[in-house]
Amino acid sequence: MEETNRQKKIGGLLQKDLADILQNSLRESGRTGILISVSKVRVTTDLSIAKAYVSIFPSKHQEEVIKEINENKSQIKHEMAQRTRHQLRKMPDLSFYVDDSLEYIDGIEKSIKGKEDPVANPDLLDKRKKS
C-alpha cells in the first residue's frame, strides 16, 4: 500500500528532526569518527508508529549505536515531541532499525565485479540456487 501525502510529510519532518537529534547526541556524548544519518522514516496510516531506518558509518559501530539509541528512545521521543508540538498532536512511537541497503548494494557490486560473477561464470548459478 502506498503512503499518503500526510504520511510522507510527517515522515519527512520526523526524518529531518531525528537526524538533527541523533547527530547532536553523538556530538554531546563525545563520540567522534561516527557518521549517523536517518535514511527513511515510515509512518503507519494511523500515525501511531514511526519506523526510522538509520545508517551508521563505520559499520563496525552499528550494533552499539543502535543499542544506545534504543536505550534512550524515550528521551528522543520527548525531544521530538518538543520540536514538533506545533505540527503534530501526538508523537508516534519510534522504532529504530539499521539501514543496511548500502552494504547490500556494495555486496551486489562486488559479486558482479569480482570473481563470483554469475554472468561471466554461469556455473556459479547452481551454487546460488536454494534447495
Curated annotation (Swiss-Prot):
Report keywords, A-Z. Cytoplasm, Ribosome biogenesis
Asked whether the keyword Cytoplasm is assigned, the reply is yes
What is a biological process (GO) this protein takes part in? maturation of SSU-rRNA
Q: What is a single Pfam family found in this protein's UniProt entry?
A: RBFA
Q: Which GO terms describe its cellular component?
A: cytosol
Its annotated compartments are:
Cytoplasm
Molecular function per GO: ribosomal small subunit binding
HAMAP family xref list: RbfA (MF_00003)
Task: Give the record's subunit note.
Answer: Monomer. Binds 30S ribosomal subunits, but not 50S ribosomal subunits or 70S ribosomes.
Instruction: Explain the purpose of this protein.
Output: One of several proteins that assist in the late maturation steps of the functional core of the 30S ribosomal subunit. Associates with free 30S ribosomal subunits (but not with 30S subunits that are part of 70S ribosomes or polysomes). Required for efficient processing of 16S rRNA. May interact with the 5'-terminal helix region of 16S rRNA.
UniProt record similarity statement: Belongs to the RbfA family.
Q: What is this protein called?
A: Ribosome-binding factor A
Q: Which gene encodes it?
A: rbfA
